[in-house]
């Protein structure tokens, strides 16, 4: 029995609240159970130097956690003077994932920055960030079209992410913190809405996992991501 009473394949309750803040071109509060992340999308004219004159846009991301997002307080990284390795890894993952959702040529020379700020962490902060930021990105792109700055929408489709893992020998979908901490295998999977894989990050924390277990985890991830994509699309029609 899982702590939440969920079945092995069941995701936590998912909520995507759009237009959560008033200034950003796209903003979403995403909730995966008790994990809550504020995702905002900011549009800026121009692109990084390495893309100037190439007629395409760019999508980048930043990620951070509020000091008391976890059980005990963590000092702000700004106070330490540098970002940690985990933070850098996660924000690069978010950016890579969301670039797969759009046609950068159609975007033109605009840069969209996704800021993902974890308000409360209970496992799956990076997967919640990707899932929520994709909705914020969609709203930002709709803004570019509705204001006449773009003729066509660059969005190719939704992208979502989920964690899966093996806990006490059982393959589980969407791990909360206590499950993630006890997992023998921990994996994060990012997919397009039609089930193509963007990124798979998997690690055996204890016993190595078999090929059959890998396939089972990917099957669980696909089911979970189907649920998340349905939630994304429902949110965008509200």
From Swiss-Prot:
CDD domains: RNase_PH_bact. GO terms for biological process: rRNA catabolic process; rRNA processing; tRNA processing. It comes from the Bacteria. InterPro entries: ExoRNase_PH_dom1, ExoRNase_PH_dom2, ExoRNase_PH_dom2_sf, PNPase/RNase_PH_dom_sf, Ribosomal_Su5_D2-typ_SF, RNase_PH, RNase_PH_bac-type, RNase_PH_CS. It catalyses: tRNA(n+1) + phosphate = tRNA(n) + a ribonucleoside 5'-diphosphate. Its EC number is 2.7.7.56. Phosphate binds at residues 86, 124-126. Keywords: Nucleotidyltransferase, RNA-binding, rRNA processing, Transferase, tRNA processing, tRNA-binding. One of its GO terms (molecular function) is tRNA binding. HAMAP family: RNase_PH. Homohexameric ring arranged as a trimer of dimers. NCBIfam families: RNasePH. Phosphorolytic 3'-5' exoribonuclease that plays an important role in tRNA 3'-end maturation. Removes nucleotide residues following the 3'-CCA terminus of tRNAs; can also add nucleotides to the ends of RNA molecules by using nucleoside diphosphates as substrates, but this may not be physiologically important. Probably plays a role in initiation of 16S rRNA degradation (leading to ribosome degradation) during starvation. Belongs to the RNase PH family. This is Ribonuclease PH. It comes from Erwinia tasmaniensis (strain DSM 17950 / CFBP 7177 / CIP 109463 / NCPPB 4357 / Et1/99). The gene is rph.
């Amino acid at each position: 029995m899982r702590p939440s009473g969920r079945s092995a394949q069941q995701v936590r309750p998912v909520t995507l609240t759009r237009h959560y803040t008033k200034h950003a071109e796209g903003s979403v509060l995403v909730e995966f159970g008790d994990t809550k992340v504020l995702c905002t999308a900011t549009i800026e004219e121009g692109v990084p130097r390495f893309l100037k004159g190439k007629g395409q846009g760019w999508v980048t991301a930043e990620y951070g956690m509020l000091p008391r997002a976890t059980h005990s307080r963590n000092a702000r990284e700004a106070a330490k003077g540098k970002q940690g390795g985990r933070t850098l890894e996660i924000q690069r993952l978010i950016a890579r994932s969301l670039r797969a959702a759009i046609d950068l040529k159609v975007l033109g020379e605009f840069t969209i920055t996704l800021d993902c700020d974890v308000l409360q962490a209970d496992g799956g902060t990076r997967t919640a960030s990707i899932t929520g930021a994709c909705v914020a990105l969609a709203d930002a792109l709709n803004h570019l079209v509705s204001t006449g700055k773009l003729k066509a929408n660059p969005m190719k489709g939704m992208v979502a992410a989920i964690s899966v893992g093996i806990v006490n020998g059982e393959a589980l979908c969407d791990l909360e913190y206590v499950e993630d901490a006890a997992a023998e295998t921990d994996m994060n999977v990012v997919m397009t809405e039609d089930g193509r894989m963007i990124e798979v990050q998997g690690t055996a924390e204890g016993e190595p996992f078999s090929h059959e277990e890998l396939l089972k985890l990917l099957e669980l991830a696909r089911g979970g991501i189907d649920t998340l994509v349905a939630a994304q699309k429902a949110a965008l029609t509200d």
